Curated annotation (Swiss-Prot):
Region (Disordered): 22-49, 107-213
UniProt biased composition (Low complexity): 130-154, 202-213
Post-translational modification: Citrullination at Arg-62 (H1R54ci) by PADI4 takes place within the DNA-binding site of H1 and results in its displacement from chromatin and global chromatin decondensation, thereby promoting pluripotency and stem cell maintenance.
Basic and acidic residues bias: start-end ranges: 119-129, 155-170
Subcellular location: Nucleus; Chromosome
Residue ranges of domain H15 in the record: 44-118
Any Gene Ontology CC annotation: nucleolus
Biological processes annotated in GO: chromosome condensation; negative regulation of DNA recombination; nucleosome assembly
Keywords of this entry: Acetylation, Chromosome, Citrullination, DNA-binding, Nucleus, Phosphoprotein
Annotated organism of origin: Homo sapiens (Human)
Protein name, per record: Histone H1.10
Amino acid sequence: MSVELEEALPVTTAEGMAKKVTKAGGSAALSPSKKRKNSKKKNQPGKYSQLVVETIRRLGERNGSSLAKIYTEAKKVPWFDQQNGRTYLKYSIKALVQNDTLLQVKGTGANGSFKLNRKKLEGGGERRGAPAAATAPAPTAHKAKKAAPGAAGSRRADKKPARGQKPEQRSHKKGAGAKKDKGGKAKKTAAAGGKKVKKAAKPSVPKVPKGRK
């Protein structure tokens, strides 16, 4: 029996080691995805910070909004934590002040009044939109270059008929002269024909010899 147990024990230990290795491999495979999720969460602003910015924008007070006003407006959101939400708002306000997203108008710490730093908020949007605005005029320049040869061709086409108009005028003049010449020739031929007709109009009288009377 002891021999059989000795033979069976290494098998069980080997199976246990294999299971441990597979578990360790699974945890190692899952760890990079967890790290990525954590890095994304760190890069993105917290939802309470976004809530603070939105509430201050909604209130729109010139002299800044206090923590009490921000809290009363922010707690209307359905996902707001009613127990710890106020402390989360304090931390997010401090972070936004350090970030230069918020300007502290009055007081010190989280007990003062806060206002949005519009230069930073609007400047970020302008910087993002600047490359797109810079690249936008490029296609219009290409279109203008493409349109320029067409315009030059149309100008050349306009100039060519101008040259061709002079021969037309000359041809008209020649045509008028030709008409005049033809008219003069027709008159001359008509006059000559009239003379011939007049000459032919005289009747030819047969001459009678004098000796036969």
